[in-house]
Amino acid sequence: MEKKMQNTIAAIATAYGVSSISIIRVSGNAALDIAKKISHLEEVKPRHAHLTSLYNSQNDLIDQAIMIYFKAPFSFTGEEIVEFQCHGGMIVAQEILDTILSYGIRLAEPGEFSKRAFFNGKIDLTEAEAISKLIEAKSVDAAKILAKQMKGELKYFVDESRDALLRSLAYSEVMIDYAEEDIPDDIMRSIVTQLDGLSEQIMKIVDASYRRRGLIEGFKVAIIGKPNVGKSSLLNALLSYDRAIVSDIAGTTRDTIEEQVRIGSHIIRLVDTAGIRESEDTIEKIGIERSLSSVEDADIIIALFDGSREFDSEDEKILAIVDALQDKHIIVAINKSDLEMKLDGDRINSYDPIEVSAKKGFVKLTRQMEALLDSIGEGEELMLISARQIEAVNRAKNAIAEAKEPLMNGELEFFSYHLQEAVKAISSISKPYDSEEILDKMFGEFCLGK
């Protein structure tokens, strides 16, 4: 009985804090026993919403809640599961959980429910990763991509790719068995064509995943400009609250400031950078270096200029940075447009600058940002949603490339070896059974109760 209890896990599945409803999840062989103990019900029907009182180990009433029992294997984890839907808040849910744990049930580790679902064959790793990412989705488009992956879109690609590699591998094994025979040209061409097609498909998926990665991670938008052009004021205006210190003293912002803000259907990472100029101040120089680093990995760059001041060498330096980043999405904005315009616009007119001030221009700016974000994220291509997935398909692609030369030279054992490595790599996307460390790391990033 003790082992039965310890093999059963429990956790609060909803966010900690004030809410209308909280959910406590219990999974394992003792789940039904615990449900009966704390509800005092003698009969609990599967998939039936029981409105019941819940009691602690001293028989004191905790709350009235909805209790649902999912009989194995027809549950998320494939095990016996009971879920308690109680009134929200920080006290009631915790007392119910404490009562469950007092009977010898173990507190679940982060991601342990999903890990059990994986080991019980209810989900594969692509679906598990999609569940984890969906919780943190940064846009509507991201949620759609992740929902498709939860339904098996990536798993289908993995299975199809694996089958194609296994067919080529089967050919090679037959050819090894009949090594004295010449390999027919049409079989050779068929294998090469199949492998080339798979490599091209993988490259397209990887390229699309890098290009659209901001859908999953959150697109990064960096504001750059010389000191005291109003970058921090722009950040505060876009956030709708004062996050950065605003001062007339040049160089007030000495480090990058990053915050999340919603633009249209996207949650972006908005970065206010230190003013870029020549400086002998050690601290300011570090801030400028970080500014340049933020620019390099940003999806969109807002280059801000002060319309109330004449164009100078520091503005020229900002434009030089912008000119060198033609592969980036650039928005040029002229700040303080409500003051007398002194900035010579000839140098920046080709960028179709947007005029902004403390009183106007932000609607046009946010609409342009939204349009760019939509264009970066658009596409129907399959996406890889984690570094682990990208690394696996790249290993498969490299192994396929390594296999082609031995095939052309008739070195079938080497061809077979590289193809087996490709099969292992592509299969590891959905089922890397050979590495407990990978599984622990991946499921450990899930939230508690998931």
UniProtKB/Swiss-Prot annotation:
Signal peptide: none
EC number: 3.6.-.-
Presence of the UniProt keyword Magnesium in the record: yes
Annotated residues for binding of K(+): N228, S247, I249, T252
Record keywords, A-Z: Cytoplasm, GTP-binding, Hydrolase, Magnesium, Metal-binding, Nucleotide-binding, Potassium, tRNA processing
Residues where Mg(2+) binds: S232, T253
PROSITE patterns listed in its UniProt record: G_TRME
Keyword Metal-binding: yes
Listed GO MF terms: GTP binding; GTPase activity; metal ion binding
A single BP term in Gene Ontology: tRNA wobble uridine modification
Major localization class: cytoplasm
Cofactor(s) required for function per UniProt: K(+)
Binding site for GTP: 228-233, 247-253, 272-275
Cofactor binding remark: Binds 1 potassium ion per subunit.
Compartments in which it is found: Cytoplasm
Residue span, TrmE-type G domain: 218-377
Example of a GO cellular component annotation carried by this entry: cytosol
Residues the entry annotates as binding (6S)-5-formyl-5,6,7,8-tetrahydrofolate: R25, E83, K122, K450
Subunit structure: Homodimer. Heterotetramer of two MnmE and two MnmG subunits.
PANTHER family hit by this protein: TRNA MODIFICATION GTPASE GTPBP3, TRNA MODIFICATION GTPASE GTPBP3, MITOCHONDRIAL
Function per UniProt: Exhibits a very high intrinsic GTPase hydrolysis rate. Involved in the addition of a carboxymethylaminomethyl (cmnm) group at the wobble position (U34) of certain tRNAs, forming tRNA-cmnm(5)s(2)U34.
Family, per entry: Belongs to the TRAFAC class TrmE-Era-EngA-EngB-Septin-like GTPase superfamily. TrmE GTPase family.
Name of this protein: tRNA modification GTPase MnmE
Lineage, broadest ranks: Bacteria, Pseudomonadati, Campylobacterota, Epsilonproteobacteria, Campylobacterales
